[in-house]
């Protein structure tokens, strides 16, 4: 019993000793810029290309929640990648239509344009795998980007990512 009391006393003493006051640490925030090239914090935000294929578009309530959270985050940049078969290319017919499924990406890019958020825009993959090295894909992709920036006025797009990963 005495041995247990001694062990408990030592443990109590050890725990109490951890509560002693520590040296005060002073933190100084300097106005000096240490990395002028730093864009800031950002996020991946894709325009829910597949939402209609899943059975429903993103609701207004979900958009409001998303925007509220992004307003809290205050991102300086967004990486926005599209999946062209759900966006501007209809795989079933083989046709290009830059106005196809434009609502969600317009909403995303409008949010970024209004808040001065830089967008790194790109495509995950070609419309169909056979187009991987086809000039037709490049032409459609560039035309769609031109449509977003010049025709619709989404000046937030500053960078273009032609492919998600090297050699897919």
Question: Model-found features: residue ranges?
Answer:
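Positively charged n-region of N-terminal signal peptides that target proteins for export
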Residues: 1-5
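Bacterial N-terminal signal peptides
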Residues: 7-17
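Non-catalytic accessory regions flanking glycosidase/transglycosidase catalytic cores in CAZymes
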Residues: 19-159, 168
């Amino acid at each position: 019993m005495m041995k247990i009391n001694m062990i408990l006393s030592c443990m109590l003493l050890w725990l109490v000793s951890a509560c002693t006051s520590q040296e005060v640490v002073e933190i100084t925030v300097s106005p000096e810029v240490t990395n002028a090239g730093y864009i800031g914090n950002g996020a991946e935000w894709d325009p829910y290309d597949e939402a209609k294929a899943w059975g429903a578009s993103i609701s207004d309530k979900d958009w409001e929640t998303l925007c509220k959270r992004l307003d809290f985050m205050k991102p300086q940049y967004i990486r926005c990648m599209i999946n062209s078969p759900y966006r501007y290319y209809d795989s079933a017919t083989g046709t290009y239509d830059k106005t196809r499924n434009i609502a969600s990406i317009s909403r995303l890019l409008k949010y970024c344009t209004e808040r001065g958020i830089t967008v790194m825009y790109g495509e995950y993959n070609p419309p169909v795998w056979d187009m991987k090295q086809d000039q037709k894909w490049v032409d459609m992709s560039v035309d769609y980007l031109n449509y977003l920036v010049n025709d619709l006025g989404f000046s937030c797009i500053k960078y273009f990512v032609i492919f998600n990963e090297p050699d897919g």
